[in-house]
UniProtKB/Swiss-Prot annotation:
GO terms for biological process: cellular response to leukemia inhibitory factor; rRNA processing. This is Nucleolar protein 8. The gene is Nol8. It comes from Mus musculus. Residues 383-400, 592-610, 629-650 have a biased composition (Polar residues). GO terms for molecular function: RNA binding.
Amino acid sequence: MQGNREMKRLFVGGLGQGISETDLQNQFGRFGEVSDVEIITRKDDQGNSQKVFAYVNIQITEADLKKCMSILNKTKWKGGTLQIQLAKESFLHRLAQEREDAKAKKEKSTTGNPTLLEKMGAVDFHMKAVPGTEVPGHKNWVVSKFGRVLPVLHLKNQQKHKIMKYDPSKYCHNIKKIPENLTETTPIAELTWELEGGNDPMSKKRRGEFSDFHIPPQKVKKVQKSNDPMESKVSNIGLRTNQVMEKNKSTHPVTAHGTAPSTVNPSKQLLVSSSGTQKPKHVVFHNSDFEIIWNKSSMSDDDVDSEDELKMMIAKEENREKPGHSSVNESEHDTFEVVRDDFKSNIHKLSSSVSLGNNHEYDSSDTDEIIAMKTKNAKVKNSAESSQPERTVSKKSSFQKIEPSNDCIKVQGINSNKESALCHGVKFVNPKFPPDSSGSDSEESEEDEEYKVLMENCPRVSLTLADLEQLAGSHRKFPGKDSETNGPQNDSHCKFDTTSKNPKTSGDLYNGRQQCILPEEIVASLLEDENTYSKQKSEEDILKPKFQAFKGIGCLYAKESVDKTLKENIAFNTGGGHHSSLKHEDHNRSLMENGSKCVNGSSSKLTSCQPAKKVNDPNHIQPPKRQCTFENQNHKVMSSTSCDKGSTNPLPGPLPLKAKTSLHLSANSHKVDSDGDACHWPESRKALEKERTNLSNLESLEKSSKVSPREDPQKSPAGFSLSDSNASCINAKDKQAEDNQKRLAALAAWQKAREVQKKLVHSALANLDGHPEDKKTHIVFASDNESETEETSTQEQSCPEKELMKESVSKSPGKLFDSSDDEDSDSKEDSTRFSIKPQFEGRAGQKLMDLQSQFGSDERFRMDSRFLESDSEDEKKELNEDKVNEDELAAEKKKTLNVVQSVLNINVNNPTNKGSVAAKKFKDIVHYDPTKHDHAIYERKQEDKEKESKATRKKKKEEAEKLPEVSQDMYYNIAADLKEIFQSMSNTDEKEEDVPRTEAGAREGTGKIRNAETLACEPEQTTGFTFSFFDSATKDEKDATYRIELVKHGKIVCPNDPRFQDSSSEEEDIAEEADHSKPSPGEAVPENEAIRFFFFSENDDRLRGSNLFWSGMGGSISRNSWEARTSSLLLECRKKHKEAKRKVKAN
């Protein structure tokens, strides 16, 4: 038994939860040797086990397997029913078996037939004999060297036609035998290339030997400047340092003459990104005291610049920048600089990045160069303006990445007196790169042209000296206001170039006329904390309009953006989502328009932009706001949109059943300070929370009221649930009582839901109508800075006419945010806002409304009651016409009814008058209530049917089977013999012989004419079936029941071959004959009267028409001629086709 065991793989299903491998081994170990057990548990999405089964590998005999299957299969064991069967073979086991079978088959095919070789005396084609001996029994087989048996071949000589005999035993003396165990196969993974070569770097790299990769240190040279900036000298150029500013670490560059190291704040660094492929070798930046030169050394150790080369390059830079130094030195201590009107700028790019590590467009570490600028105070947030002519050469790759800025002049606000005092201290000049070895001039010219094309759409702002002085002085008036305010500040208050990731100047402010002073660059680098700037960038990721807003359009943009932000707030709240920030196209458009230059009046005053300082109070969290300022000649509208980041109380949504809070609009919102905002927000949010809870309760109750008719019968105290098995046992009364209880429960639930719904609606409407005065429903937005409020107040005092205009604008319902001063007037307007005006009522009012809709909402064309037309004459005419039309219609209807009545002999008068017919009224569907006595009429009374006896049922069955009795009364006469009818018809009708339908016969048949007098003189005999609507009038004119008329055939003379009868002369003859053969109007067509049988007879009139479709014997002649003609036509067509082809080829 032990020897017959085989490895079997069993599937064991239906196992319980707590079964282990040892349990299965003990259970199946009785029948064989268990080698492996694999338990598999299938689980659902929640992790609950659904199915447990196992695979058991066991060495077992066939008998033991049958015994195991019969004993254990379908038995309950540890909470499960076992199911045992042979498992499917594992694919790995099957794959190994297939490989072994293929290997054995291959080996078997390579071995030859052993019996044949044994007969030859050779084993595997090897014989122990001297080379040259023939194999016995086999002709042309010879023993070669090493005992191999080879055939003698007859080969053809290549040079001669002679066939030579090739004996392999005579050419085998130089063969060497290679032992089989000499070749050692190495695995593929261990195979390597071995390339011979020297110790030069290329050979080492080919062999895969690379030296350790070291980043060469960046070299910082400090050149002390003399008093004259034109004669700056470089000393100690060989000084190199490895202390390089990296990311957010502050560094201490070593000075040339051992002076104290200058500390540089990492937040005040300026990053200049160059293009990826073209790297500047020398970048020179001018500061107030010294020049810093950064050298990017190459990656290889061999490429190191010598001191002589450095001196030559720096001398070139100094020669290039001599005219630049003079202009910088002259205006070094001024607050601002203005460029001469004859200057033409060709700046390609200046990209300065403040965010370190967050720059997505220029994040390559090997192309960024970090420049430290010396500042006198560590708290400087803003740096100076410079307008020095520069020229930079950039690659086209970086040039295409950077879009031109729409804001050509960027002015950053300065937050303190110290900042404004230090404004002139730092000057910055763009780097100048040395020209490359070849092709730099052509690239410069191409890029100049491309840049001019790109910068054509840039707006050109002309500034005067007075404007710039006023701009510089405006920052000194309000120092440190932003640091004192604790409320949410403006994160992006306007003139940022939002398409590029860093603020940059957009050059080429070239004006063709050059009549005004054009500042080429007024650069203000916003050097704030990188985190703050990156957050601002995420919020300012807004879209640009296609064209820049010009003067006077700011108000239109403001109105559009204000309306759209109101719509977006409502859509945001209906969705119920808690969004962190509003990022959509319309709001971005309004913010971007805020970023455009808004010109107030005729003066070109630029609004300064002040970056907001974030409140560092950890316990104080306020939502960031974005404030948009729109200026026009007449009025200024300020709006702000705020949303809570992650807050649980978003902006108000629409209230249920028209309970919506109206946002009162006013143009004076910029007067209100930020404290008003803090006051009104919590109150409005509490009211909104109440309304939202009411809305949710209402929705839940509506759902419950919809479900209650199905659920309540099951939840009723009686708890009736009828099944099909016992339904027949319950009598009708019990069933009716049960149905009544179900109806009562449904009624109670329905009434309860209706009452709750009414209460909710009532409370919502009460909150809407009786709103207390202290709780304002509208939102008041304050201005961010006190400086702005002061500016607007001074402007309002100086311009009372503008104030009056603002008040008139605020009354129109088109503006978004109003102040709290107009609350009373707005509440009155709300009551009369949706009431229909009296001049628009009635038919004339409808005409007035149509006339008003043509003008739209234009204030100049407001239609009132003065425009109403006098409708007396027109309406009277219309009424008279309607009455006349109705009278005519009634008379015509009466006339037609009389005609129908006289014809059909029936009374068609409408018996019912309009007054007698009761109008159909809609009555509410009565909900049956079993408790009310009035509703007893709706009940269907059940009558108990008595059981019929067998005798009565049998009697009814016999009555149903009886045939119905037919009365013997005769109501009509039946002609017993049909011969009388046919005889009377034969006497009256004249028999005519049918002529065969030929040409002559057809003409004769059509030529027969009978006069009307002879027809009238003929005696009339009754033909049996006659009927007339009018007895006396029509008795004299009785014709036969059926009249046979010959069909006139137009122009076809020969019906057999109509193809050959198509000449014009024949057609004219036929037309004349047909005209002669037409009977006159007073003549009648002769009648063909004959006895008509059911079956067709020979020469029957009814078969005459079908003769047209029969072809006679002459058809074969026409067919032959037609076939001959078609063949000749085909030949001619082919000939013409070939000629046309030849002409086409010749052309």
